[in-house]
Amino acid sequence: MANVSMRDMLQAGVHFGHQTRYWNPKMKPFIFGARNKVHIINLEKTVPLFNNALNYIGSVASKKGKILFVGTKRAASDSVRDAAVKCDQFYVNKRWLGGMLTNWKTVRQSIKRLKDLEQQSQDGTFDKITKKEVLMLQREMAKLENSLGGIKNMGGLPDCLFVVDADHEHIAITEARNLGIPVVSIVDTNSNPDGVDYIIPGNDDAIRAVQLYLNSAADAVIEGREKNIEVQAEEGEFVEAAE
């Protein structure tokens, strides 16, 4: 599994936390010190924790598990989508709708509505109704795509969440926790690490840092999937040899 080095993290600014006055005391074990009233994260703690989290994500992917990338703030939104698309996984990058996991039955109905509208827009149904009706349906479709587009093909609850900002996405983490879904999350010095199974202490605002986390996670998923294919191929060879 590809490992991320301390040099990579330093260059991306992973070690810069928040201003000291905003800190969460529960993050004390992961803080090296402070400089100019800004907490410095101890990368000697972060590096092994991050690589352990990547190994876990890779193992989920190797078992064909579904990974949901979550990051709805502006600094993370595009990178979250790009990473999920890169490794053929799922994402929420605009707004976390309350109950997205805990009320999956209702979410599934909304996804069905989105897919029905997509079908209607392609099969000629829109040609048979008024322009005003088409406009209303297009707006509804765009709204649904905006909030559910990244999970419309998930086909059920995810096996794991990869969260960019534990503080900003606390509702998603709580829902996952209630359902027993493991959570991997970037946790900055102002955040509460409770409820996170795989804590990655690090800067959750710098775009370069966010991209480092997400690209590494996407690569771990891809490697995990490839490992699964290799194992299946080997098992196939054993079966042939036995015959």
UniProtKB/Swiss-Prot annotation:
Pfam families: Ribosomal_S2
A GO molecular function held by the record: structural constituent of ribosome
Any single Gene Ontology cellular-component annotation: cytosolic small ribosomal subunit
Record bears the keyword Oxidoreductase: no
InterPro entries: Ribosomal_uS2, Ribosomal_uS2_bac/mit/plastid, Ribosomal_uS2_CS, Ribosomal_uS2_flav_dom_sf
UniProt-listed GO biological process terms: translation
Keywords: Ribonucleoprotein, Ribosomal protein
Coiled-coil zones: none
Source species, domain of life: Bacteria
Keyword Ribonucleoprotein set for record: yes
PANTHER family linked: 30S RIBOSOMAL PROTEIN S2 PROKARYOTIC AND ORGANELLAR (PTHR12534), SMALL RIBOSOMAL SUBUNIT PROTEIN US2M (PTHR12534:SF0)
NCBIfam families named among the record's database cross-references: rpsB_bact
Family stated for the protein in its record: Belongs to the universal ribosomal protein uS2 family.
HAMAP family: Ribosomal_uS2_B
Protein name per the record: Small ribosomal subunit protein uS2
Species this protein is from: Pseudoalteromonas atlantica (strain T6c / ATCC BAA-1087)
Source lineage: Bacteria, Pseudomonadati, Pseudomonadota, Gammaproteobacteria, Alteromonadales
